């Protein structure tokens, strides 16, 4: 009888560890997806700004899906991605006149990832919250105006 109780206890401990590892793997996968989607949105904003000589920023995601400045279909973003951490809408980083500069997650968790970021995201290694991971294109980033 004692032997059976010890086996149940060991199996319970093992299953708890497996659950922790599984949760960590899911969190890491969601972080990777957050970086991928955020970088894609930032690249779309940059593409929109660079596509015309006036360097105007988009007003919304709709402008990225179909550029209203041209009469033919020009897409900078194929779809509006949801935030993979919250599974909801992104929070927007906007300019003084409502221009869309970028996005960030509204998730309150602490990121697991601390290094190995791309050059565009290297500042994320110092951030302590997903809300601080901002995928932004600012006009003052030395962007070349054509």
What is each stretch, according to the model?
Residues 43-146:
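Low-complexity, acidic interaction segments enriched in glycine
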Residues 1-18:
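N-terminal single-pass transmembrane signal-anchor helix
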Residues 9, 40, 63:
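Ca2+-coordinating acidic residues in Ca2+-binding motifs
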Residues 12-15, 38, 42:
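Hydrophobic faces of stable alpha-helices that mediate helix-helix packing
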Residues 27-38, 54:
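Membrane-proximal amphipathic alpha-helices
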Residues 13-29:
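Transmembrane signal-anchor/signal-peptide helices with a preference for the extracytoplasmic
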């Amino acid at each position: 009888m004692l032997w059976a109780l010890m086996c149940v206890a060991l199996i319970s401990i093992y299953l708890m560890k497996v659950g922790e590892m599984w949760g960590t793997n899911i969190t890491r996968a969601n972080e990777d997806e957050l970086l991928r989607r955020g970088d894609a949105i930032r690249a779309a904003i940059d593409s929109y700004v660079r596509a015309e000589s006036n360097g105007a920023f988009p007003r919304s995601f709709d402008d990225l899906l179909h550029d209203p400045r041209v009469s033919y279909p020009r897409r900078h973003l194929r779809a509006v991605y949801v935030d993979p951490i919250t599974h909801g809408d992104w929070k927007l980083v906007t300019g003084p006149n409502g221009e869309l500069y970028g996005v960030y997650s509204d998730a309150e968790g602490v990121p697991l990832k601390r290094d190995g970021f791309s050059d565009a995201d290297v500042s994320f290694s110092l951030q302590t919250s997903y809300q601080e991971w901002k995928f932004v294109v600012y006009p003052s980033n030395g962007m070349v105006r054509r």
